[in-house]
A protein has these predicted regions:
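Single conserved hydrophobic/aromatic residue that forms the stacking wall/gate
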Residues: 1-7, 11
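Short, glycine/acidic-rich hinge or "gate" loops at secondary-structure transitions
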Residues: 5, 107-109, 127-138, 183-190, ...
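Active-site core of glycosidic bond-cleaving carbohydrate-active enzymes
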Residues: 13-49, 53-54, 60, 82-104, ...
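Sequence context surrounding c-type heme c attachment/ligation sites in exported
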Residues: 58-69
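Short glycine/proline-rich turn/loop motifs
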Residues: 67-77
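Short Gly/Pro-enriched turn/cap motifs at secondary-structure boundaries
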Residues: 79-81, 156, 222-223, 358-361
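Acidic/histidine-rich catalytic neighborhood
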Residues: 117-177
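Non-catalytic C-terminal accessory modules of carbohydrate-active enzymes
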Residues: 124, 132, 284-436
């Protein structure tokens, strides 16, 4: 059979490049982020020229297509190339690196300056919708997809949902970064005002999370891209704990895509399904998508592929993003920390009744080890890599567990109705949770 080595021999910032780094933080490989961050730094230099010449704005911006010479302007097809929040999406890795490592020096010297300049661009780029008062991006696209409107199939609109998600993430990351560093109060205040004027995530008449600001018909319900579900993963603007109605609407998006005739089942979209279902605490569905990826979308050498016939591909295309995004999804099945607390095996399938892991990482700066048997936790350990309060969700009856800190039993732990308890740990402290 024929295989192609690449889709178009460019770096794509509409999901593919980002997927290659979703695994790094949770898998304790944070040092592997360094090349990406150097790339973002170089990209921002070219992106300042694009911001000025294309949009007349300060700061920096980059779009979907990139190459080794730092191409940052809108390029290629309009239905995926005119995507200014691509820079925000790839820049979000800077903030996530800090969340997992708590590396304040990195945040001060590299992460926050890049995020701030990107946020500066969007503060000037956003326009107020005269009808709703919301701040809007645009014209922009929900990459590669399009909608039907008054008999037309269109790709460009104002504030597609993915843009709203990404601008919110950027502004929120900058606000939190500046608070951590104790700087830029006026800039923080500007971002807080702007973030309040962003439109909400909305549920359409079909019960799905809307992909566009207006409740329009999806022209390609079988499309491989579902960029608006960034809100579910890798971000957490939609979660079962905090936004249950939106979580149900996100699940409907996923279920409808998978059941659509001729769904475009490719390596990156199938790998995304693992993480989406893990976040929705649907273990069997997550495992099914992992199984499909391994049976259908991977070669004997373990390279993941985008199958021939999809997206105009003349033959199977090897793309690395599936190789990275799938294990990131597996990690999400085993450990989550995006809802404000640590949860062990939140999406454990029946096929994995016994197992263990060591050294997976959580937001807030910690490493977790876990052993389970007969689909039940036997022992969990959390080692702090920074001084802070951690929150842990206990599985089942709190009376079934013995808690130890550095080998000493902890008593009188305050556990809330959701079985979550807080604990203060110093760097290298070790919390143990054992089944009695």
């Amino acid at each position: 059979p024929l295989y192609s080595s690449a889709a178009s021999d460019v770096y794509k910032r509409q999901v593919n490049t980002q997927q290659n780094y979703w695994l790094t933080n949770i898998a304790n490989l944070a040092e592997c982020n360094a090349p990406l961050f150097n790339y973002i730094g170089a990209l921002s230099v070219a992106g300042e020229k694009t911001a000025e010449k294309v949009y007349g704005c300060p700061g920096w911006v980059a779009h979907t297509v990139a190459n080794i010479w730092g191409y940052t302007a809108p390029g290629s097809s309009v239905n995926w190339g005119l995507f200014p929040t691509a820079s925000t999406w790839i820049g979000s890795h800077l903030w996530h690196h800090y969340l997992f490592t708590q590396d304040k020096a990195f945040l001060k010297e590299q992460g926050y300056p890049l995020l701030k300049k990107n946020a500066l661009f969007f503060l000037h780029y956003l326009v107020e919708d005269p009808h709703t008062g919301y701040l809007m991006t645009g014209p922009s696209t929900s990459p590669e997809n399009s909608f039907r409107y008054q008999g037309w199939e269109l790709a460009l609109s104002m504030m597609p949902t993915c843009d709203r998600v990404l601008v919110y993430e950027l502004f929120d990351a900058c606000i939190q970064s500046a608070e951590v560093l104790g700087i830029d109060q006026d800039f923080r205040d500007s971002l807080k005002l702007a973030i309040q004027k962003l439109p909400p995530l909305k549920i359409g008449k079909n019960g799905e999370v809307q992909e566009w600001f207006e409740d329009v018909e999806n022209a390609h319900p079988n499309h491989r891209c579902a960029t608006h579900l960034l809100s579910l993963y890798p971000f957490a603007q939609i979660s079962l704990q905090h936004t249950p109605e939106l979580a149900e609407a996100a699940k409907k998006v996923i279920d409808n895509r998978l059941s659509a005739p001729d769904w475009e089942d490719v390596e990156f979209s199938r790998a995304n399904m693992i993480s989406y279902y893990a976040r929705l605490k649907e273990p069997e569905e997550a495992y099914h998508s992992l199984s499909v990826l391994l049976r259908k979308l991977i070669q004997k050498n373990l390279f993941t592929i985008s199958a021939a016939g999809i997206g105009g591909a003349e033959c199977d295309i090897y793309i690395f993003d599936g190789n990275q995004a799938a294990p990131a999804g597996i990690a999400e099945m085993l450990l989550q920390s995006h809802e404000g607390y640590v949860e062990f095996i939140p999406a454990l399938p029946k096929a994995w009744p016994d197992g263990h892991f060591k050294g997976l990482c959580i937001r807030g700066g910690g490493e977790a080890d876990l052993e389970w048997q007969n689909s039940e936790i036997r022992k969990a350990c959390l080692t702090a890599r920074s001084d802070r309060e951690f929150k842990i969700k206990l599985p089942g009856d709190p009376q079934q567990w013995r808690l130890k800190k550095n080998g000493k039993t902890i008593k009188n732990v305050l556990i809330d109705k959701d079985r979550v308890f807080p604990i203060l740990l110093k760097k290298n402290d070790r919390l143990e949770i054992e089944k009695i």
